[in-house]
Amino acid sequence: MARVCVMMMAMAIAMAMNIAMGDPIAPCYFIFGDSLVDSGNNNRLTSLARANYFPYGIDFQYGPTGRFSNGKTTVDVITELLGFDDYITPYSEARGEDILRGVNYASAAAGIREETGRQLGARITFAGQVANHVNTVSQVVNILGDENEAANYLSKCIYSIGLGSNDYLNNYFMPVYYSTGSQYSPDAYANDLINRYTEQLRIMYNNGARKFALVGIGAIGCSPNELAQNSRDGVTCDERINSANRIFNSKLVSLVDHFNQNTPGAKFTYINAYGIFQDMVANPSRYGFRVTNAGCCGVGRNNGQITCLPGQAPCLNRDEYVFWDAFHPGEAANVVIGSRSFQRESASDAHPYDIQQLARL
């Protein structure tokens, strides 16, 4: 647990420094993503992908909010480190001048492709999230009273995008519902995702976004759900899935480099969630983890065959589990990922900037 304590202390110091300076180091934080960072947008949707029930939020100060975690998500951690005095409001609840702090558009089960996650019901796709942001931008213009003023304000904000996981988990590797796995090679599928991703980034850029943090896909083949289904020993990750994830991530890095070279006035960076996650799994004791292959709350093999059910009693030693449920990291892991995204521990954590550096550019 020593490593976790050191990281928590460093996080507390960074937060104290930002608070001491007064305002957050970025005026606003816009979040696009899926269940890893959804903070309640799916609560009002007709969807199986919802987490607004106990024991989700068991360790969160506001209880079950729709976050797919026992506590904070990675973006909650980053929000604190940026110096905000409260978490970013989900789009479904954002009203008035609150949007000047930023908005969380993330939606559980969402993907880059429109059809991704449809078997789970309603969700807000990447394109839908960007469309919601365009609506937010028009509101920012109305509040600030001038397009130039709004453009200047928005250019200083952080735009975090973390999508693609469901395009593999709830599309490419789900042949019962989707044909993409037989239509595309892993390389061709990643190209298709990157092309669609690029379209949305251009829309965001045309609506004032200038500081982008593109979060790579984690090692989905190591999740309790995949281990329960596809691992003979319940420990060995599914390399078929992880290999496809690495192909996408490699192309995302190339996209960051391309945009940095060809997009006037904008800065892009890549957050290596895959590498940070792999470090936690390979060196669990460094972070105080004892269980890397099972959910703290779930049903069946690896607590991963069915995800955490309403009212189910979770494990008591939650900080010792990398995973909270069948798919999602717990707060302890999110603190590690969020902290290293904000201030990289090694050069490989972020390319070419960490989020703190991006905010100060």
Swiss-Prot record:
Residues spanning the signal sequence: 1-22
Major location category of this protein: secreted
Compartments reported by the entry: Secreted
Gene Ontology, cellular component aspect: extracellular region
Entries under CDD domains matching the protein: SGNH_plant_lipase_like
Pfam families hit by this protein: Lipase_GDSL (PF00657)
GO molecular function: hydrolase activity, acting on ester bonds
Entry EC no(s): 3.1.1.-
Keywords (A to Z) from UniProt: Hydrolase, Lipid degradation, Lipid metabolism, Secreted, Signal
The organism's place on the tree of life at top rank: Eukaryota
Positions of the catalytic residues: S35, D325, H328
Broadest EC class assigned to this enzyme: hydrolase
Any single GO BP term: lipid catabolic process
Protein family: Belongs to the 'GDSL' lipolytic enzyme family.
Protein name as annotated: GDSL esterase/lipase At4g18970
Source organism (scientific name): Arabidopsis thaliana (Mouse-ear cress)
